[in-house]
Amino acid sequence: NKSSSPNLTLGFTSSNSYDLKNERKVGYMASLNYRSNISYFDDYLESRYEKSLPAFANTVYNTGKLGKDERFISFLGGIAYGSKKGKQKINFLFIQNGESTAIQGDFLNNGENNYDGVGQIKSYVQRQIISIPFSSKNYFLDGKLEANLSFTPSFSRVYDKDFKTS
């Protein structure tokens, strides 16, 4: 297992709250993170076993070199407003991951793949999550009645951007 620079992790965070007139407050938070990780394996081995009577049988045996480049970025931001009459909060969360993989090796025909010999596999996959939680708490009749509202629209996607064999 070899690692190639630039494996890197960076993070930035900021938050604060402010007092306003008439016992009101407003606050914010923000966080940004980035990570990259590059790995290389000289002795990659893919092996799958199937249970067949009376013993386990090796059905796939591929060897070679594997390189992997993973990138991860996330952002979390939000604002809040509060007063005697209630509090409202909204946040925004974004997470994205990209992964590139390259394999150069010897591949054996296994029924799934009709190829015997030396070859290359290159792939790129990207995953993404977006979430926007909102909540509101309101007081009425001098605090005798409370009304709450919250919802969180969320979206997730997986993109198989690229897959090549040769």
Residue map of PLM features:
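Generic structural motif recognizing short loop/turn segments at the entrances and edges of beta-strands
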Residues: 24-25, 117, 143-145
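Intrinsically disordered, low-complexity, charge-biased terminal/linker regions in eukaryotic proteins
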Residues: 84-85, 102-104, 109-117, 122-124
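Transmembrane beta-barrel wall of Gram-negative outer-membrane proteins
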Residues: 1-103, 127-134
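Face-selective signature of the C-terminal outer-membrane beta-barrel domain
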Residues: 82-93, 97, 125-166
